Design a protein with these regions (language model features):
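Conserved N-terminal beta-strand and adjoining loop/helix that marks the start
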Residues: 1-16
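Glycine-centered flexibility motif
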Residues: 5-7, 25, 54-55, 61
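Short, flexible beta-strand-to-coil junctions
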Residues: 11-12, 20-25, 64-66
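Short, hydrophobic/aromatic-rich beta-strand segments within well-structured domains
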Residues: 17-18, 72
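A short gly/proline-enriched turn/hairpin at secondary-structure junctions
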Residues: 27-31
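Unchanged
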Residues: 33-127
Length: 127
């Protein structure tokens, strides 16, 4: 099972984090879940490993992407147009996005499905 992180700004609407994988291009942070690891734990771990960011897992949805979980994570750091470096050697850069970047490993339809998802219908992880 894998997890995808929908990391959004708690300060500004419409901003989310993507990472630029050296071989695949721009994608949402995420990866394989460890044995016994809950989706929200895996999401927070992957977000930190790939983007160097900490956040609060708010909700989870297992129907958005086939074979995986999407975890909504709120991040309370300033939104900036400037990219930053990742601690993960496979990640070229990290940045806040307002639209799906060119050279995206994800199809625009997949991202739009997540952008437009009504998280109130998902499993809440508390406040």
């Amino acid at each position: 099972m894998f997890v995808v992180v929908w990391a959004v700004s708690s300060r500004e609407d419409g901003c989310w984090i993507m990472v630029k994988n050296r071989s695949r291009g721009w994608e949402l942070p995420g990866g394989r879940m460890g044995q016994g690891e809950a989706p929200e734990e895996a999401a927070l771990r992957e977000l930190f490993e790939e983007a160097g960011a900490l956040g609060t897992a708010k909700a989870i949805d297992s129907d958005l992407i086939e074979g995986g979980h999407v975890v909504l994570v709120e991040i309370d750091i300033p939104v900036s147009p400037d990219p930053w470096k990742s601690m993960d050697d496979s990640i070229e850069e990290v940045g806040w996005c307002l639209q799906v970047p060119e050279n995206s490993a994800w199809g625009g339809e997949e991202i739009e499905r997540i952008i437009n998802h009504d998280w109130s219908t998902s499993i809440s992880l508390g406040s």
